[in-house]
C-alpha cells in the first residue's frame, strides 16, 4: 500500500490527552467584567449627555436669549433702542426723540 499523503491523526509529539490550561482559565467571566456591561454604561452616558444638551438648547431658544437681552438693556439703563420682534423703522429726519446720542 502507498504511504498516506496527509496525516489524519496528529503525531504523538504534538498531541496529548491532558488539557494544557487549568480549570480556572475556562471559567466564564463575571457579569461586571463583560464588555456588554461596559457598552451599556457608554450608551447610558451618551443618552444623558444628549438629554442635557437638548435641555440647554431649549432653554436658550425659549428664554435665555430674552434674559441676556434684558440684562444688556438694564446695563445700558435704557430700553428704547432694544426691539422685541418687529419694530417700526425710524425715518431719517426724526432723529432721537430724547435728544441724546444713539
UniProtKB/Swiss-Prot annotation:
Function comment: Involved in the viral transport within, and between cells.
Transmembrane segments: 43-63
Keyword Cell membrane on entry: no
Localization, UniProt: Host membrane
Keywords: Host membrane, Membrane, Transmembrane, Transmembrane helix, Transport, Viral movement protein
GO biological process, alphabetically ordered: transport of virus in host, cell to cell
Name the UniProt record assigns to this protein: Movement protein
Family in the record: Belongs to the mastrevirus movement protein family.
Pfam families found in the cross-reference section: Gemini_mov
Membrane disposition: Single-pass membrane protein
Keyword Lipoprotein: no
Assembly and binders: Interacts with the capsid protein (CP). Part of a MP-CP-viral DNA complex.
GO cellular component: host cell membrane; membrane
Organism taxonomic ancestry: Viruses, Monodnaviria, Shotokuvirae, Cressdnaviricota, Repensiviricetes
Spans annotated as Disordered: 82-102
Domain of life: Viruses
Amino acid at each position: 500500500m502507498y504511504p498516506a499523503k496527509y496525516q489524519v491523526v496528529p503525531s504523538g509529539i504534538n498531541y496529548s490527552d491532558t488539557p494544557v490550561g487549568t480549570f480556572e482559565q475556562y471559567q466564564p467571566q463575571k457579569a461586571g467584567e463583560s464588555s456588554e456591561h461596559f457598552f451599556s454604561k457608554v450608551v447610558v452616558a451618551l443618552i444623558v449627555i444628549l438629554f442635557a444638551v437638548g435641555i440647554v438648547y431649549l432653554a436658550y431658544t425659549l428664554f435665555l436669549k430674552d434674559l441676556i437681552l434684558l440684562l444688556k438693556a438694564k446695563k445700558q439703563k435704557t430700553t428704547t433702542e432694544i426691539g422685541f420682534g418687529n419694530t417700526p423703522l425710524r425715518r431719517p429726519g426724526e432723529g432721537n426723540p430724547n435728544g441724546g446720542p444713539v
